[in-house]
């Protein structure tokens, strides 16, 4: 019988695992830290080991070989998953079962090892879902926040180069023009004076003065805050305002285009008709009676040699004529 595919690296892992366990056993205390390091790399198999202990309890199965085979199947599945990089868990399970078949010759131990591979599969799937949930994802509003941050940086850099100042032009009595130019001054809210700690030395007049001073300072601060609140809000949210303005402009342009196309007059030019058809339509509209062919009188004149035209025929009143 041919060996399953991938049996060489499985044998290498099976041979390497006892060596690692022996090294950790000889190390004593540091072996626990090494085992934890391997668990973090290969994956935690404690849940699978508990499932094996519930399946093969020692009071029901006095032999420990089947329990160890089941726990070894859990570890083999973790090793196969580490080698395959967890791409396909079904393939990892098949490789784990083939490794169990090569490692154990008895059917009971093979079944226990296969059961360990099967028990580790749902825990591996859960770990993959947890790793996928930890991956960073882009939020839908990330482009808008990026535009806002870029716009705020541009505005900050522009404000650093632009210096605002007040300029006044006054004309003196002698006719000279005097120019006063000053930079804006920053007004800070006056700090509240701290009340003295010794209440015995403080007087009522000083307390009333401090209260009046604090109320006046608070009122001035609120007035300054109300005046500067709108401008500060505009400066902080300038990126959002620009973005909304662009979006609304595009929507208005689209609406104007659609409304123009929907309400436009159809440019239809009727084809010109011949005059004979126009005469027939005029006759039909006026409801005129047509003369029969028998009531028409045809007058013919003989052709003469000279070029001058002959006299016109006499007018005949058809109403007084009888044919």
Curated annotation (Swiss-Prot):
Maturation and modification: N-glycosylated.
Localisation per UniProt entry: Late endosome membrane; Lysosome membrane; Cell membrane; Golgi apparatus membrane
Residue ranges annotated as Extracellular topological domain: 36-238
Chain ranges passing through the membrane: 239-259
Keywords tagged on the record: Autophagy, Cell membrane, Endosome, Glycoprotein, Golgi apparatus, Lysosome, Membrane, Signal, Transmembrane, Transmembrane helix
Keyword Zinc: no
Glycan-modified residues: 90
Motif (ATG16L1-binding motif): 263-281
Classification via InterPro entries: Uncharacterised_TMEM59
Segments on the Cytoplasmic side according to the record's topology features: 260-323
Free-text comment about domains: The ATG16L1-binding motif mediates interaction with ATG16L1 and promotes autophagy.
Functional description taken from the UniProt entry: Acts as a regulator of autophagy in response to S.aureus infection by promoting activation of LC3 (MAP1LC3A, MAP1LC3B or MAP1LC3C). Acts by interacting with ATG16L1, leading to promote a functional complex between LC3 and ATG16L1 and promoting LC3 lipidation and subsequent activation of autophagy. Modulates the O-glycosylation and complex N-glycosylation steps occurring during the Golgi maturation of several proteins such as APP, BACE1, SEAP or PRNP. Inhibits APP transport to the cell surface and further shedding.
Similarity section: Belongs to the TMEM59 family.
Protein name: Transmembrane protein 59
Organism: Sus scrofa
């Amino acid at each position: 019988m041919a060996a399953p595919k991938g049996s060489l690296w499985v044998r290498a892992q099976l041979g390497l695992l006892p060596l690692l366990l022996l090294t950790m056993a000889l190390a004593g205390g540091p072996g626990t830290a090494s085992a934890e390091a391997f668990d973090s790399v290969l994956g935690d198999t404690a849940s699978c080991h508990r499932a094996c202990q519930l399946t093969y309890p020692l009071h029901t199965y006095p032999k420990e070989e089947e329990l160890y085979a089941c726990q070894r199947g859990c570890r083999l599945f973790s090793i196969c998953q580490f080698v395959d990089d967890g791409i396909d868990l079904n393939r990892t399970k098949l490789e784990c079962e083939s490794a169990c078949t090569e490692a154990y010759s008895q059917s009971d131990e093979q079944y226990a090892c296969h059961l360990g591979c099967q028990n580790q599969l749902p825990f591996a799937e859960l770990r993959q879902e947890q790793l996928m949930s930890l991956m960073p994802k882009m939020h839908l509003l990330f482009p808008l926040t990026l535009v806002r941050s870029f716009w705020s940086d541009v505005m900050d850099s522009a404000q650093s180069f632009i210096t605002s100042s007040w300029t006044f032009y006054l004309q003196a009595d002698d006719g000279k023009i005097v120019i006063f130019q000053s930079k804006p001054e920053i007004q800070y809210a006056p700090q509240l004076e701290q009340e003295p700690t010794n209440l015995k030395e403080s007087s009522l007049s000083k307390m009333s003065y401090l209260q009046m001073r604090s109320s006046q300072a608070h009122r001035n601060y609120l007035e300054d805050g109300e005046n500067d609140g709108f401008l500060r809000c505009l400066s902080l949210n300038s990126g959002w305002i620009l973005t909304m303005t662009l979006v609304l402009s595009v929507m208005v342009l689209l609406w104007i285009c659609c409304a123009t196309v929907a309400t436009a007059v159809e440019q239809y030019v009727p084809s010109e008709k011949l005059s004979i058809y126009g005469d027939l339509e005029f006759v039909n509209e006026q409801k005129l009676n047509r003369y029969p062919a028998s009531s028409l009188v045809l007058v013919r004149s003989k052709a003469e040699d000279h070029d001058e035209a002959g006299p016109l025929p006499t007018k005949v009143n058809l109403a007084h004529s009888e044919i």
